[in-house]
Amino acid sequence: MQPSHFSPTSTDAHRFTQALAVGAAPDGTEDAQATYQFRTLWLSDIHLGTRDCKAEALLDLLRHCHAGTIYLVGDIIDGWQLRKGWYWPQAHNDVAQKMLRKARKGCRVVFIPGNHDEFARDFHGLHFGGIEVLSDAVHVTADGARLWIVHGDWFDGVVMHAKWLAHLGDALYIFTLTLNRWLNQARHRLGFSYWSLSQYLKGKVKNAVSYISSFEQLLAEEAARRQCEGVVCGHIHRAELRKIDGSIYANCGDWVESLTALVELQDGTLQLLMWKPSASAPVVLAELPPGSASTGQAEAPTQPQASHVPCAS
């Protein structure tokens, strides 16, 4: 399956380069040390340019983590919402600056656009401030596993064939997030913890559960067809790391609600992390040890070990 051709408008292209250009200057923070060192870091569905993007939490992760390669797996910039009205607060600016600074300091940063930043797909093969733009990619882990990296919207029939319905669904999702924000403000005042209305609805609606299962199966099958041992994707805002019919299926989650990332340790171990800025360490939600591409299943997660290294962020 190949992406549909998209010709960005001049406004789209201007906003894309403008969003990257705002990070041209240093972000004003100098991190003496990074707490965690990873071989690879995957992030998706950040949705910069929206009010529900948790940019401050992401910035905290970027300050504490160093990786040799960072893959931005789509929907990094929310072009759909920016077309409706420009929203770009300082925290979103800081995230862009941090990414560009990492690229300048030698980190390989690869941007794989999704449907919300599809305007960038015509820039395939180009570099902006050291950030490489690709439609998809193949990553080879330390233990030799080939992972196909793609946002995932190519496998969403609504996005590909009924874009008006996709935009309607996005509007309903934004409305749900707004309700969720108000609800959790009230819960916080009453002393209750965070609760996700959108995740609750996804789990209760039969069609949503069926859609997620089909999406995951299709991605795993396509990765195998491409002679890869697994796939890393985003799009559905559902963090996951497991085996499907022998193939690794990894979904980075999002930075709207779940605050999750996929990482590869130096030995090829894959971990799905949930980042909590106030916590002493990220929560490891799932883990696949080296060699899992051929034999293993997800194991009980272990906490990542803090490794103080010179920060290249």
Identify what each model region corresponds to.
Residues 2-20, 34-39, 50-142:
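Core catalytic region of metal-dependent phosphoesterases/phosphodiesterases
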Residues 2-17, 133, 200-229, 239, ...:
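Non-catalytic terminal accessory segments
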Residues 40-42, 70-72, 148, 232:
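Residue-level marker for buried hydrophobic side chains located in beta-strands
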Residues 48, 77-78, 154, 238:
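Short active-site segment of divalent metal-dependent hydrolases/proteases
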Residues 129-136, 148, 153, 157-167, ...:
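Conserved beta-sheet core of the metallophosphoesterase superfamily
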Residues 140-143, 239, 243-313:
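Binuclear metal-dependent phosphoesterase catalytic core
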Residues 152-215:
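Active-site-proximal loop/helix segment associated with metal-binding centers of metalloenzymes
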